[in-house]
């Protein structure tokens, strides 16, 4: 498949950049578009070479804008539209089945399945058709092999023994091509052959009103040259024995996993510039999230084993009553790393001495199988609680004898354990350049960031000498990565850590059900029932180092006030009580429980709960008289604290996760589905041409009607929780609650679902941020400033209370319809024609409306709040599913 749309890229370049790429012309662009004076002699030779680089077609690699109309470019969001090769997707599949009868009592079957589906995109290294330049084609090589062998033996007339073994290999590796290497332009990356990912931002100084002047090229994401290869081996054995009224089943299973992560991002640097003039003059944007080269071991080889066994007895207590009972044992072995490249944080080991400002124990532990750094008393997985459990299961089915077998009552109860620890839960939160599923492979101490400095240049962004290996000879040297208070006050970035809480227990769920089925007719049955589920010890990302509230009565690490921002008075003076500005903001880094670790450090913690209750009604009509019918209706409610498996906590204060207990993100109150097939009767019964035309027709369809999904309102601009994270909250999705006095109903624009702009479904004025007043929750009281005035800090805010998934998106409906025609040509050959009408009435199903607002458009240490907030709140921007789509097919059956 070829997709020309994904082969396009909208690019932002300075509006007055021309084909004259002389230093004088480029300096003029800096002056005209940015108001910055650049001497032509100041232009860096690397930047000049990139701007003068031409493609094989004679066009410039960094293109000349196709319009100089500021208004048009602002409307489009770009001033150059590039057309590259089409994006391609290829899928190849093959399968083989083999059955062999060893004897009358022994049967062996084998299956093999192969699948490979590579994709290419000329601009996907920067996330699709947005901002990339040609030459850096992104390829995702994905595929799998699956093998299974099943052996079934009839040991005796009442004993059956079955054994299974299987193997699955999966791969998904992304790579980015490059038209040139760093050496060609004189960029010193210590021998790396990979061109760096380059980002040229627009910091707001552009004279143009074009919203985003960002230009990116090269492998600018952590997914540009990384992937995984997974091998899974499985085996099981089951024995069934029928003895009188008892049907006894026993068995066991075993599973072994090899997850190998290959990450080449320790060879790919990231370079970022504030704007085009900074790019010209080689002024790199500093900070780990901007200009960085990761140094160390970035491959991982994870291993895990699972095992289980069960025994179950299905007892025929009476002719109309069956009861099944039995326990199951599950052991979900935790992940380990083949070479011990696995670290964790143990809060009980950490120790900080406040009087001397010394971290005497950094709290990091390393897997025992690490020969150089293994921590005594720590296992290969670093987890401490048991990762196994015993799960009882009970079921019953009863048919009242007086009803002639027309009605059956069924019920069941069971516990089910599940793995809580996954590879993605080792990664830290966003914001420091090594987030995402592969972030753990770039996380200290086995990999450390090499940062650009004020003396860095485009030619030598990280100095002239290769960096030394990471300080992993012993944990004492690793402590150099974790700053004390003095270092934090001077601006040193704290260590961002992500991990799976070593104290976690194994998650499990308790399921129960009760239903009644009535066979009204031979081909018609009705079912009504109730089912429920309660999840325990579910995992959710919790920041273990969220700052505490410091007050004069309750100091924290010597701090007596709490502030995330550093607002100024009219003359630019700051409060004498707010003179610290740490990396995260204000004095946040000094109020944390563990000095030296980032407030955004996260543990995946197995403390969450969930509940699900549902009334289910169904009708099933087997095919008779040409009609087949299946219908179901579910009235349910799912509640939890955390619905997704992403890197962010969705709720209010993450240290009080129960405050975010609400409807699940995927909750659907009402769901109705109807599937049908009607075969038209035979009109003629002879073998004439007319008979072949008239007979064999059928109609089928699927109808789905369901409630919309829940949603709430977010603000990521630092307007919620600034007292903890300033504007640098990289771990939570901060919820904005209602203005006091407003209700869920009053916040909704009745009769306006949000699909007809400019009228939104929600009233922006109904929402407010939880601002704090001077003297409240540790905020300094009004007082003197550095310029002698009296000033008040009124810009601090806390987390909201409630508000998660308070609203619900539009109701959704979809009707699909098909016409079928089957014509027999001979006894063995037939033609089957289908005409499928997906969404036949072309009814739009609207997605949830936009729920992201901005109360702080400044997004900096001196916020500028606006009420009501900015953003397209309550306006629907997407639909779910496709418009009406018609397809026809013709099959030959033989």
Spans of model-derived segments:
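Short, solvent-exposed micro-motifs at the edges of structured domains
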Residues: 137, 143, 320, 334, ...
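N-terminal, post-signal-peptide soluble/periplasmic segments
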Residues: 1-67, 171
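Extracellular loop and loop/strand-boundary signature of outer-membrane beta-barrel proteins
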Residues: 80-84, 132-137, 146, 150, ...
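Solvent-exposed loop/turn elements at secondary-structure boundaries
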Residues: 176, 182, 194-199, 204-214, ...
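Flexible, surface-exposed loop regions and adjacent strand-edge segments
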Residues: 124-134, 178-199, 230, 255, ...
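Gram-negative outer-membrane beta-barrel proteins
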Residues: 116-122, 169-177, 245, 256-264, ...
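Membrane-embedded beta-strands that build the outer-membrane beta-barrel scaffold
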Residues: 1, 94-102, 106-114, 147-155, ...
